[in-house]
Amino acid sequence: MSRIDKWINEKEMPNLSNAERLIALLYDLGIASLDQLIILTGWNAQKINQALHDIRNRVPIPATFKRDKKILAMCKKGEIKLSETERLKLEASLKDKKAKLDKEREKWLVAYQAHKTAKAYYTLGAEGIRYATLMRREPFTKWKITPRQQANHYHGINEILVRLRKAGIKENDWLCGREAEQELYYYFNRYKKRKKLPAKTKLYYRPDAYLVLDHQHDFFIEYDTSSESPSKLKRRFQNCLKLYQALKEVEAKLMPPIVWVTVRESRKKRIEEIAQEVLVDFKQDHDGENIIVPPSVCFVEGEDTKFFAGQIDPKPFWG
């Protein structure tokens, strides 16, 4: 069973509420839309919306807010009389209390849209992250909070998994970038110890996700929104090669192929060109060494599903 599924499965985690299950899932996904949550949980929209509501309601409505809201409603119905000054003062007070309540609730769950007609995205706030780490017995750090500016990136990563599910392909496992990083650090720390590198040396490269289809097919996943500059892409490819060289000394056999997914054909070609350029330079810089080059392919969104289903056999740009 996939690690993200165990939090949703009532037999695996019988004591969790639906709100807690969704907190755990959002922690893995980073940012997700309602339609993605429907596919990945198997719940209907009503059940998900109720769970989202319950997460936000972990911050209860203050009694004074309820009281003032009731008074204002009675005033509008003519059941009680307030002077114009009293009414305006009450409305201002309610508006202020509502803003404070929303701010506190966003510490658990943030819902936002790029504009009024855009798709809504959901992500955990600091308290939601803290609660998720408690359930997982992980340390809490603020860097685990997902920046909302990366909504398109996280949505694109999640769509890779959603397309698989829609195609009837059930993964054996799916790790978000954070969890994949934790797995890699085990081997990277062994490498650091062997090379006597400083303890603070950071992992050279972290994939966006790790997909296991079965015991013979697993992949690192990279999703590209086309927002990264060529220089950033070059550093990413260079750091990827750097990590594969480092880990070949401790556990090279566990390093899987890499699947890149991007938004359009022209971007795909550019990614492949940059990757080839970096590889040529890397080999020149490591002349005489046995370079480990991970088999890597790139797809426009949608083609990746055909690849995972075994329907196409693309030419890799590396490996």
Label every PLM stretch briefly.
Residues 1-145:
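Nuclease-adjacent, charged terminal/linker segments that flank catalytic cores
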Residues 2-10, 16-17, 40, 58, ...:
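Electrostatic, structured charged patches in enzyme active sites and in nucleic-acid/phosphate-binding
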